[in-house]
Amino acid sequence: MSETIKIDPYGFREYDARWLYPKNINGEGIREVGRGFGTQIIKVKKNARVTVGYDYRSYSEEVKNYFVEGLISTGCNVEDLGLCLSPTIYYSQFDLNSDAVAMITASHNENGWTGIKMGIRKGLTHCYEEMKELKDIVQDLQRYIQ
């Protein structure tokens, strides 16, 4: 790893995750969130196929690349849909029959923010309990690394 992992735990919200990038989360932190999500996915299905996309921000592709590295490290197979809208990612779970989805977006937030909307159950994004589990997994991964 080239830089110290930075993840502000307050970025994990009820239904998604949002941070100022790179102030509150850096690339290594995004990679760890990808590992955490991958860990959740492989508990449901081994060798899962995950569709991933990103929004129009100039740094979103970079964030997506870190996130995908984390997913792949857990054994997930990733299909990158590239620059797209959130509904495209949600629809991909049905049209492409993917096992999980992730969208790199800060939605309506101003430039400087990044975020991740994700889901495993078809047609649904993570709920409070799943986001809490993800936060716990990521924090456990950090303790393991240190």
Which ranges hold each PLM region?
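Gly/Ser-rich phosphate-binding catalytic loop and adjacent alpha/beta segment
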Residues: 2-10, 17-146
